[in-house]
Regions:
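Transmembrane helical cores of multi-pass ion-transport proteins
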Residues: 1-423, 487, 519
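Active-site-adjacent beta-strand anchor residues
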Residues: 75, 504-505, 530
Length: 547
């Protein structure tokens, strides 16, 4: 693994020169402009602080990039992760988040070491779309107070919204105007300009200037930005204990699962953009190490972010140094512009997050499944989205995957069975119509024969005509499991007890292996297997003549 990493690193920097260095520096600067407002916003929306989001972006941008599985990944705090963290902060405080981040990092590290990166391929796309949309809803719900300048109570977003019925909903007009200003700027900002100066950055600068000029003192601001990478609120290793671990098992798994999903999806997408290889397992190792280190500095969990990564690629990024430079520029901003960032209105950051939440949705994919009326895809999407909003990400993914598995089993259990008499006229090597063919039939089986299809298989076999000689054509049966093999064995035993002969033809290698292991081959004999039905019929005729 280390050898492969060093080899890929050597290839990445082969022919590196001043021109490529300048491209990495400029790409890093551009990504910094995108990452700065997002880091501040996601830090606040996670229930931590803007400084925590900034530290996360700086540390992750260096550590995860250097150890990562590709040259193009840019990691940091994300909207999806912040939506998960806000509930953990409400229940367990910042120390709970730091501990969960540390433990989730260890899980990601182990996942990379044991090469579990391919697990992401088992999550259906509608499920991923569903939890992404669910997270977008959670982000938007979590910013209602900051955007409208209201106050709510509750440990979850749903509880906070419900509290408005008791506390009342009294928007602060100044906060709403600042939030709307940012939203409008982000929407109307030209894409060609956004490639260099993102609309989110322009929006929060304008919002800060407007709030200062018009003395909008009633609006809450970001507050103090410490000029240090070692925040006062950080993981206290002395506080780690088994009881905390037991309480945080679900959040730990949630953070690790989200880190894996976001990072690997981002890597796969950017890999296609750059036409470069992506080592999923190495990326998980990098994400693990990064998330183990982050809470020691006071950072929150990080993942690879598609928004920042795509900006880097489009800005001419050459190597992973672009991510390092983005962190350097963020660090410079922290030390040089900390006093300015402290005055940023929370309503402005809420505006950024509202637009970000809207853009998070895979609108192309959503339109596709609804416009084509793909009922299974729509149900997978809706179930996962609602579960994400009502429960949490871990439950949502488990529900989505379990529901998808049930749909697959239901569809796969529709096994096809048909019966066909022998038409001697279609047999090229047979003249006339031998009497034995009148009591011979071919049974065609199509579809995988596994536990979900056994009942239908048995029901159809009970309708088999009274053949004396049965030939099973299994060319359309690609797979079989133990339950299916047991059903075939019992059927063959029953037919033989009735004095009937049984032959099989057109078996896939995997099906033949199961027949060998489950005793079907011993029961029927090796001479009962043929390449096609005609060969089986000719063998039957030969045996008839010999008698």
């Amino acid at each position: 693994m280390i050898k492969n990493y060093l080899t890929s690193l050597k290839q990445e920097f082969s022919g590196y020169n001043t021109a490529k260095l300048m491209k990495d520096i400029m790409a890093g600067l551009t990504v910094c402009a995108v990452a700065l407002p997002l880091a501040l916003a996601f830090g606040v929306s996670s229930g931590a602080t803007a400084a925590a989001g900034l530290v996360t972006a700086i540390i992750a941008g260096v550590v995860i990039a250097v150890l990562g599985g590709a040259s193009f990944q840019i990691s940091g705090p994300t909207g999806a992760m912040s939506a998960v963290l806000v509930g953990i902060v409400a229940s367990y405080g910042l120390q709970g988040v730091f501990f969960a981040c540390f433990a989730a990092g260890a899980l990601l590290l182990l996942a990379g070491i044991f090469k579990l990166g391919r697990l992401i391929s088992f999550i259906p796309m509608p499920v991923i779309m569903g939890f992404t949309s669910g997270i977008a809803i959670i982000i938007a719900m979590g910013q209602i107070d900051n955007f409208f300048g209201t106050a709510s109570e509750g440990s979850s977003n749903l509880a906070k919204i419900a509290s408005y019925t008791r506390l009342g909903f009294h928007p602060n007009l100044q906060a709403v105007l600042i939030g709307l200003l940012v939203v409008v700027v982000m929407i109307v900002w030209p894409k060609k300009w956004g490639a260099r100066v993102p609309g989110s950055l322009v929006g929060i600068i304008l919002a800060t200037v407007v709030s200062a000029l018009f003395r909008m003192d009633s609006i809450a601001t970001v507050g103090d930005i410490p000029r240090t990478l070692m925040l006062a609120d950080r993981l206290d290793l002395g506080s780690l204990n088994l009881d905390m671990l037991k309480n945080l098992i679900s959040p730990i798994v949630t953070i690790a699962a989200l880190g894996m999903i976001e990072s690997l999806l981002c890597g796969a997408s950017a890999s296609r953009m750059k036409n470069e290889p992506f080592n999923a397992d190495q990326e998980l190792i990098a994400q693990g190490v990064g998330n183990i280190l982050l809470p020691l500095f006071g950072g929150v969990p990080a993942t690879a972010a598609i928004a920042r990564t795509s900006v880097a690629v489009k800005s001419g990024q050459q190597t992973r140094l672009a991510s390092v430079f983005h962190s350097v520029f963020l660090l410079a901003s922290m030390f040089l512009l900390g006093s300015v960032m402290a005055r940023l209105p929370l309503a402005a950051l809420a505006g950024v997050l509202m637009v970000t939440a809207w853009r998070m949705n895979d609108w192309g994919g959503i339109r596709y499944i609804f416009s084509h009326k793909l009922k299974s895809g729509i149900s997978q999407f809706l179930i996962t989205m609602l579960a994400t909003v009502i429960f949490d990400l871990t439950v949502a993914i488990l529900l989505g995957v379990a529901y998808s598995a049930i749909l697959y089993i239901a569809k796969s259990s529709q096994i096809g069975v048909s019966f066909s008499d022998i038409d001697a006229n279609k047999l090229r090597t047979v003249e006339g119509k031998p009497p034995v063919l009148e009591t011979t039939g071919v049974v065609y089986v199509t579809g995988s024969l596994f536990f979900g299809a056994v009942d239908e298989f048995n029901r159809r076999m009970a309708e088999m005509p009274a053949y004396d000689h049965v030939i099973f054509s299994l060319r359309g049966m690609p797979n079989i499991d133990v339950s299916g093999a047991q059903a075939v064995l019992e059927l063959c035993e029953s037919l033989q007890k009735q004095g009937k002969t049984v032959a099989c033809c057109g078996m896939a290698d995997g099906v033949r292996t199961y027949f060998d292991r489950t005793g079907i081959t011993v029961l029927l004999g090796e001479n009962a297997y043929f390449w096609n039905a005609e060969d089986a019929i000719l063998d039957l005729l030969s045996a008839e003549i010999a008698e």
